């Protein structure tokens, strides 16, 4: 039986692509383990999947000054030792890393044990963890073809993003019943990320009188961002977040308004949903969402509205543009084959 160790954490985006790959390896009888941090979100997610989980010390990799930067290099070194010992005991055939600060000690620990390491990078440019890990890896899978120019050519394999199988199995009838919607108007699903997005939430709600004339709205507004005055608004349903219902909601969705995190937008792409992307500004991120959104716009998958340009009028104008050019967007979206990503990655895992 072949063995694999997965790693990646710090945010859900460094875990969910692993979840898309794991079921296929289970079918092929791989022995699967996961190494992550003691208290990261990856621990909560993976333990629900009935996969052996091993914790190591980890320090965050920061690009800015913080007093914790004095302590964290020692935590990283401790993490490398923890990972080295754990990997020596597990004896995996390959390590697959999705990035995030916890992955660096695992990648180095694998390299010290002479275990082949494969990386996956979701964004257009590599994050700090993958930049460090790359020198210890044999291959790096990229989600965007344009990402190759930022990486060593001999290590890059373009795959696209692995998408969880359950996302593709939504039921429209269940969504209609859950939301209380009709078939008479198209549905827009609005997602501002797990914490919501204040400006998006406020602008959407200001635009509701105009939007609800033509559309039904599902608004995933983030924790603590519900508006009680809108709870019974016809054609408008708001949730802090949804879990098992999301595939059904996406099945009934005609257009998506969203941030431009890579994992989410590739799910929309695989589902062939035209998108209005409002990326995080450079003031709130390293600018990766802007690059992601602009790539999708160039390929005809999405329209981009920059956060500093978000107003009621600009939002309505972009939604109308999506609707008016729906056929052109759908033609472009149909050219993408999302299922190839998982098969390509599994092939290289098996060959490692």
Swiss-Prot record:
One Gene Ontology molecular-function label: undecaprenyldiphospho-muramoylpentapeptide beta-N-acetylglucosaminyltransferase activity
Membrane topology: Peripheral membrane protein
Recorded superkingdom: Bacteria
Example GO BP: peptidoglycan biosynthetic process
Binding site residues for UDP-N-acetyl-alpha-D-glucosamine: 11-13, 164, 194, 289
This protein's pathway: Cell wall biogenesis; peptidoglycan biosynthesis
Pfam families found in the cross-reference section: Glyco_tran_28_C, Glyco_transf_28
Catalytic reaction equation(s): di-trans,octa-cis-undecaprenyl diphospho-N-acetyl-alpha-D-muramoyl-L-alanyl-D-glutamyl-meso-2,6-diaminopimeloyl-D-alanyl-D-alanine + UDP-N-acetyl-alpha-D-glucosamine = di-trans,octa-cis-undecaprenyl diphospho-[N-acetyl-alpha-D-glucosaminyl-(1->4)]-N-acetyl-alpha-D-muramoyl-L-alanyl-D-glutamyl-meso-2,6-diaminopimeloyl-D-alanyl-D-alanine + UDP + H(+)
Compartment(s) of residence: Cell membrane
Cellular component GO terms held in the UniProt record: plasma membrane
Its EC number(s): 2.4.1.227
SUPFAM superfamilies given in the database record: UDP-Glycosyltransferase/glycogen phosphorylase
UniProt keyword Glycoprotein present: no
Key words, A-Z: Cell cycle, Cell division, Cell membrane, Cell shape, Cell wall biogenesis/degradation, Glycosyltransferase, Membrane, Peptidoglycan synthesis, Transferase
InterPro entries: GlcNAc_MurG, Glyco_trans_28_C, GlycoTrans_28_N
Cross-referenced NCBIfam families: murG, PRK12446.1
Family that this chain belongs to: Belongs to the glycosyltransferase 28 family. MurG subfamily.
Reported function: Cell wall formation. Catalyzes the transfer of a GlcNAc subunit on undecaprenyl-pyrophosphoryl-MurNAc-pentapeptide (lipid intermediate I) to form undecaprenyl-pyrophosphoryl-MurNAc-(pentapeptide)GlcNAc (lipid intermediate II).
Name of the protein in its database record: UDP-N-acetylglucosamine--N-acetylmuramyl-(pentapeptide) pyrophosphoryl-undecaprenol N-acetylglucosamine transferase 3
